[in-house]
Amino acid sequence: CYYAVLAAKGFISRDEYANFRQLHSILQGHPDAKKVPGIDASTGSLGQGVSIAVGMALGAKHLGKDTKVFALVGDGESQEGQIWEAYMAAAHYKLDNLTVIIDNNGLQIDGTNDQVMSLGDLPAKLRAFGFDLVELPDGNDLDAVEAALSKPTMPGKPKAILAHTVKGKGVSFMENQVGWHGKAPNAEQREQALKELED
């Protein structure tokens, strides 16, 4: 997802997609700020992205800047304690300039979230941590995501967009398949996936 956004914004070429997760490619499973333009920090599955976003949002407030900060996280990485510490800080410092988008597809590299470590009632937890929660039943609906991003933020509250998504949506052999979490398709699979997405 993040590489598609970077390509749409002109930071990288779409031609790079064919090199995803290949040796010496700039497009690895976890974005590398030293190799990929448009990435502010190298983060990964340990939840550092939300902590960095909280720091950026707090810094912007401290400097009096009208800056909005966005963090995109997965539900699997939301099992990390660092995420919850960052959420607690975001609410404590009333970071209404922070939006956290949670891709909630129920799958991660080792299986389903419930098999690995259940997040329980995630909406209730986000509210309890002081977030203005926007829940999207179809997080694959980009119009709904755009509307959620455009929704005004409640003063003094960070915003969480909980997007219930389907991993691999629209590609028959990838949809809801945990094995595709960090795997790049071969040339034949790539062509089939592109054809299915065009239809």
Question: PLM features: residue spans?
Answer:
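Cofactor-binding active-site loop characterized by glycine-rich and histidine/acidic residues
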Residues: 1-92
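A short alpha/beta connector and helix-capping loop motif
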Residues: 80-105, 160-162
